[in-house]
Amino acid sequence: VRSADLAKHGFLAPASILTESAPLNSIKGNRGIEAIAVPPDDSAFGGSLVAIGERILLGGNHSGWVLSGNQSRRFKIRRRGDFDITDADFLPNGDLLILERRFSLILGSAVRIRRISAADFTPEGLATGMILDGLDLMTADLTHQIDNMEGMAVRVDPDGTPIILLISDDNMNFFQRTLLLEFALRPEEFGVIPPPRPAAETLPRG
């Protein structure tokens, strides 16, 4: 994994080795590292990077790593419902959000956002070998306005409301779409967010 300080040097920034982790170097194929997230500076893993595999399974569960300097620490996320992980980001309070996607010829496509509490995602918690799980913030299927949701980012409105942005990849296929979805995670709804619009509803253009 290489790191470059674009803020200081722009696109001419020299890249430097962030970690030489043997587990990451040995990952092959198209189900490798899919999500990279930066924890808040004041969180348990501030100053590190978190990398999670799309479908790197260990004992049937997803694998992720906390990368800090030349050190890496592996952790596990419980795999539920045949979903793969496509992205991740952190809320300001240190909770880890996981974007998951499922595609099945029988069940169709679905997307899910899970929230893993900062109280569980700690060096002490990972040292016990615990399997992280978390709460479902949102689950949607093809009855809603979704597609191949692969990207997620979190920003914060001036009033402090976390905004979750999701984007899909159409893979240059005529039967897929590029969608940008936005959700407000309000305090009174912190345990759940409503799913996207119904699929039968026409989206506005512009």
Can you say where each PLM-predicted feature lies in the sequence?
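Sequence/structural signature of beta-propeller domains
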Residues: V1-G206
